[in-house]
Amino acid sequence: MFHGGGEEVGNVALYLEDHTGTNVVIDYGMVPSDPPKYPSMIKNIQNAILTHVHLDHVALAPWLASTWGTQLHCTPFTASTCELIWRDTHKIARIEKHPLIWDLHDLDEGLRMLRPTPLLEWQDLGEWRWRFHDAGHIVGAAMIEIDMKHTRILITGDYDTRATPTTNAAIPIEADIVFTEGTYGGRNHPLRSETEERFLAAVERVIDRGGQVLVPAFAIGRSQDLLRLLERSNKNLEIHFDGMGRKVTELMLQHPDEVVDSNGLQAMYQRSRRVTSKTDRKKAIERADVILTTSGMLNGGPALWYLNRLQDDPRSAVFLTGFQVPGSGGHSLLEKGSISIWGKDVSIACEVDLFPLSTHAGHNEIVEFVEATGARDVVIYHSDAQYSQPALVEALATSERRVHTQKNDVQFTLPITNSSSES
């Protein structure tokens, strides 16, 4: 049963149980909207598996750990980053005066119950066994393979079959049942290489005319990918790196086995100028070619401080690289050319552009991935029920493959086969 994420993007909480009574929760997140949206409550659960460290998958896990003593299984990088993400979640909830079902004591319990688990190592869970596979998407993201002896299940979490500068591509495995995210169902991405080249050309054009480029970026994954991408510029760019992305990069470098070319990331990180004080921010405004900082949707973070100072400079630019949720600062900037900065609507004279560098599988990638698993049953989740899910149902349903969509908080049953499972 989906307690969240069944008919929506984010807010993921999936409860699985079979006839033996073995059970598990996959993710327990929230939608960081205003106000936030939470999944329904789950009771008496001993094990949860967290696919990756984004808020919509892990935000409420401390409550599980503190309330039910739930063990929180995740990859080592995810485990090392949860504290940073959870503390930031608590801080924002306090500032915005939003309700949060856990407190700092619960956070400490969440940290105590983390169980770092490497990729590909089988783990026992009641009558089942399970293991992680690389999901792409961001560093530490994992797909979950569950072997129920007679049925093999694959839960993708967020995944991408296209490699990035810091992640490998997700590889399909054989499964009887696949739960696939469908964020981009019905939509295909432009070629990533073309978007990257367009981004680099735009950065160099702005520098040539004497401007600065502000790149608001998501802290986990996007900031590090952009740092590596900027390395390919023909210019010796002076990059100033601010915000939570800087801290996340340091955590990534503590897990080099989970990062593609960690030596390259470390070299580029050392080359960048790390912003750690107000004085450093003033230096960035005076000297930087590129300022890379959070937040990726311009909802807060140092990015607004920089934008407030660049607002009247038509030579400079703000380059967004991710989906901008309606209601976010980035969405307002793209649609209206203005943004709320500390409660005041401000018109921005800078050039503004969007370079979509999503690390979710697009429609075609989802279809190809699912077909390659050979699954007889497919459940689409983490997707829009009005557009994305119908498009994927139409593309995937065949006489030999059933495709399911599920509402939240409605129990559903999938058949178990008698086929044997192999290691």
Question: What is each stretch, according to the model?
Answer:
Residues 1-43, 116-168, 282-283, 290, ...:
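Core dinuclear metal-dependent hydrolase active-site scaffold
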Residues 26-29, 45-56, 60-61, 72-76, ...:
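Active-site neighborhood of phospho(di)ester-bond hydrolases with catalytic His/Asp-centered motifs
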Residues 136-141, 149-176, 181-184, 188-190, ...:
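Active-site-proximal loop/helix segments of hydrolase catalytic cores
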Residues 243-256, 318-357, 402-422:
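Short, flexible loop segments at boundaries between secondary-structure elements
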